[in-house]
Amino acid sequence: MLSRKMLAVHDISCVGRCSLTVALPIISAVGIECSVLPTAVLSTHTGGFTGFTYRDLTEDIMPIEDHWKSLGLTFDGFYTGFLGSYEQIDLVKTLISDLSNDNTTIYVDPVMGDVGKLYSIFDSEFPKGMCKLCEKADVLMPNLTELCFMLGLEYKEGPYTWDYIDQIFREAEVFGLKKIVITGVSFEEGKIGAVFKDYETGATGQVMRDAIEGYYHGTGDVFGSALVGALESDISLNDSVRIAVDFTVGSIKRTHESGADVRYGVDFEEGLGEYNRQVRIASEGISFEIVDSDLQVARVAGMAARIWSEFWADKLKEGQTEYMVNKFQSFQPIKDSIDKGYEYYILKSGGQDIGYTGFNFEEDRVFISKIYLDRDYRGLGLSAQILDLIRVRALSEGIHKAYLTVKRDNLQAINAYKRAGFIVSGQADTDIGNGYEMNDYILEWSF
């Protein structure tokens, strides 16, 4: 894929991680060319600092655009953030119209408030002006405060219900968006994150994480920049939101644990390598290598020994993991199951073996025996690609159902499968020998 050219239109605070000082490094970290157009220059951002300097750059916007037009420049994406006046909103609308191409995507973060209040520099009419820019957006990235002000709705403190958020999604249809991601949403005490809707497909979702005590400046810009970088890398909305949430939460955690002065923003720099890795994996996806040789069986057995000993270490009785690997997932049992009709696939990313899956066709459904990933590749949305492989193989055999078993206290896996469309259909208690028993739920999936 050719590198896309992004223009970030924000202010620049010389000290304090926010706006352009986070947008440029984060978006560039995933290989996207990021040009900048500063709307103002501040000595520091305005949160927690006094005596800061502020130079408005409104008068520079059109001369800069005129020079770019003379060079024949267009941009594949625009990412707008803090705009300090109605005039800047109008100028940015013109900029977008003049410098877009047929494939341009418009990302708007309507920075103007938080926690139910507008920032002090904005009057009560400013949200109406920002609405005009939002009508040009393909992807809108407000917090709930900003969205309520623009829609003329009363801001309510959380926790929220999904019905309330769904109502907000419907109200936001007025902007004619393709996608919306709303930050600062909580459905239960101690959890906070982002919700999203793809208006083109109707798909909705949420990504919630543990709340961290305190208020951290610049996190909206960190999140928005990470989201833009992921979406511009051709990653799904669901995975892009997850990556952006985890990147932001990781930045907050590092800052909280270090005891750093929160006025200077969050420590996002240390997480750029992991952010790049997650974007690369999600963008490239995984490849599947069918297991049909003894050497490949040995590779699967090696992964099973490694992954099982790590994953099940604190979940099974002493000695049970080693017993189960030897009985079910060592070389000979895997080879025997393949001889009986099971299909095994090695999962690969970047040329490396990262996991495996195994399944068997029965009369009218598929039994999914194994889906295992190395620790560093869990939680990256890869299970959806594995399930899609199984679904496609099943449909090729005229089968529309699958099932699997999950340990009844493995709530994380159960919830993940439920999100993928599985339902709990029963229980199974299986004596596997040597005094061990597996107590599982049976989960079924129709497609």
State what each model feature region is.
Residues 2-108, 112-120, 269-280:
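Conserved N-terminal subdomain of the carbohydrate kinase-like
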Residues 14-15, 204-218:
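Short pre-catalytic strand/loop immediately N-terminal to key active-site residues, enriched for Gly-Thr
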Residues 121-204:
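Conserved phosphate/ATP/ADP-binding segment of small-molecule kinases
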Residues 214-237:
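Short, small-residue alpha-helix embedded
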Residues 216, 352, 374-388, 395-397, ...:
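Conserved glycine-rich acetyl-CoA-binding loop
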Residues 238-285:
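Charged C-terminal helix
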Residues 285-376, 387-393, 397, 425-430, ...:
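Acetyl-CoA-dependent GNAT
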Residues 403-407, 418, 423-441:
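Conserved catalytic-core motifs of GNAT/GCN5-like acyltransferases
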